[in-house]
């Protein structure tokens, strides 16, 4: 919701010229300024929005993804990420099979497992989930720190609903477990795969080489995103829409 931008203490605009071509929404950025918030503009050219920002991060066209992956690596490598939020509101704790790179399903461990999503939960009553969709999605698995074992989760088990189950998902984990057929399955959390596999190619020097962005400002933005809360990232026109 664009309305939420006005409450941000940090507003990062990527690929969007709020001043010139988003005049219906640029007052939100002005309100951030009035409240003493910080503005950051990421764009190839220095334009009106850049002139209003606290700092402008220039970037080579079509390299925004590399920049954001590099920033993610800095945040994770410095343990600046919000572990509690990632556990409760993201898919990072969910387990993946290393052999197929697909999610580890409860049925992989117990062939008699039955899906546990309640028809009275938010998926059905609020989100409008259909049984046909749920049959395709199924349930998920995490490695629980408390019991030191794999536990099933439904798509409703987030936030307070996860805490009520008294499950503490391990975020950064890999291991070997026994499957329903008795064979060992090598698994890892999505966070583990993201941190040690996907992000390993996006060290700071490599990102600078790809994006032509300023090294110090990349580090500054990573620190700002990790420490200034609440923050908003406003992405415009799909980033690669024009290039």
Q: Locations of the language-model features?
A:
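The substrate-binding groove and active-site-proximal loops of carbohydrate-active enzymes
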Residues: 13-19, 204
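Glycine/threonine-rich flexible loop motifs
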Residues: 17-29
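A short helix->loop->beta-strand "cap" motif at the edges of active sites that frequently abuts
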Residues: 31-39
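Acidic catalytic cores of enzymes that act on phosphate-bearing nucleotides/polynucleotides
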Residues: 219-243
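Long, well-ordered, tryptophan-enriched scaffold segments
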Residues: 50-51, 55-227
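Glycine-rich oxoanion-binding loops at beta->alpha junctions
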Residues: 1-11
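Short, polar loop motifs at secondary-structure junctions
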Residues: 42-48
